[in-house]
Amino acid sequence: MLKKYLFLTKPGILFGNFITTLGGFFLAAQGHVDFLLLILTLLGTTFVVASGCVVNNVIDQDIDQKMERTQNRALVKKTVSPSTALIFAFILGIIGFGILWFWVNPYSFSFAIIGFVVYVGFYSLWTKRTSIHQTIIGSISGASPPVIGYTAVTHQFDVAALLIFLAYGLWQMPHSWAIAIYRFDDYKNAGIPILPVARSVYRTKVECLIYIVLFAAVLNGLYCFGYTNVFFLLTFNVLTAYWLYLSIIGFKAENDQLWAKRLFLFSVILITLLSLSFSFTYQSPAPNLPLF
């Protein structure tokens, strides 16, 4: 019984957002971690993301039954009713937003609201089904957790918060498109107008390359503005250079699905290492460059 509800929350997505929230928190903490605040921030963010994922499951029932990788989900198999799932999502959301509002701060709460509304409203209900730009919209929600973690410590939105918001958003593009190429038939059968399906795999490869370069340029800004140290500069650029290399060899790939799987898996490794590295690649004291 509990397993069904756990999988409604999409554990893989929860883990990914847990790691990126941790990364934002570490960057802001500069080695001085308030562990109670960290636990509360992680719990609040995880419950909010879980709530959004459950609602997404309810919205995507018709799509999920057409895709091989999702056709065994509880709502598709009708082992959990939509009304029960929505009640579950509501409880998760109340807990998550409550933690962020009462025990973290209004900045983290606000970015949780932004991420939730974009994911459920603008992405799941609208652009996922209608627009080639769905991935850009969805990236806003994906970029919110590291900012939640960062602002939990700083109580302000500064240049570093802007840079990590942009960078994590840019990372989402090749990451998501790689999944779509790897699962091309699933997305095509479900009628989802994601870039590889709506345009072409070749165009997707070109745009993956562009977004990886933009991702690198933005994150290097953390060093340029004085938020990270030289070790970050070197290791981050080595990792990103390899990701760029994987993107480039995709143009000569004999099997697009295998290449896309490789690109996707490395994107996960990259963002995980990047997020965890903020625990020791920060520059202290960090500059005070508030935006609001």
From Swiss-Prot:
It catalyses: heme b + (2E,6E)-farnesyl diphosphate + H2O = Fe(II)-heme o + diphosphate. The lineage of its organism: Bacteria, Pseudomonadati, Pseudomonadota, Gammaproteobacteria, Moraxellales. This is Protoheme IX farnesyltransferase. It comes from Acinetobacter baylyi (strain ATCC 33305 / BD413 / ADP1). Keywords: Cell inner membrane, Cell membrane, Heme biosynthesis, Membrane, Transferase, Transmembrane, Transmembrane helix. Belongs to the UbiA prenyltransferase family. Protoheme IX farnesyltransferase subfamily. Carbon 2 of the heme B porphyrin ring is defined according to the Fischer nomenclature. One of its GO terms (biological process) is heme O biosynthetic process. Its EC number is 2.5.1.141. It is an enzyme of class 2 (transferase). Converts heme B (protoheme IX) to heme O by substitution of the vinyl group on carbon 2 of heme B porphyrin ring with a hydroxyethyl farnesyl side group. Pathway: Porphyrin-containing compound metabolism; heme O biosynthesis; heme O from protoheme: step 1/1. The gene is cyoE. InterPro entries: Protohaem_IX_farnesylTrfase, UbiA_prenyltransferase, UbiA_prenylTrfase_CS, UbiA_sf. GO terms for cellular component: plasma membrane. It is found in: Cell inner membrane. It is a multi-pass membrane protein. PROSITE patterns: UBIA. The chain crosses the membrane at residues 13-33, 35-55, 84-104, 106-126, 135-155, 161-181, 206-226, 231-251, 263-283. Pfam families: UbiA (PF01040). The keyword Calcium does not apply. One of its GO terms (molecular function) is protoheme IX farnesyltransferase activity.
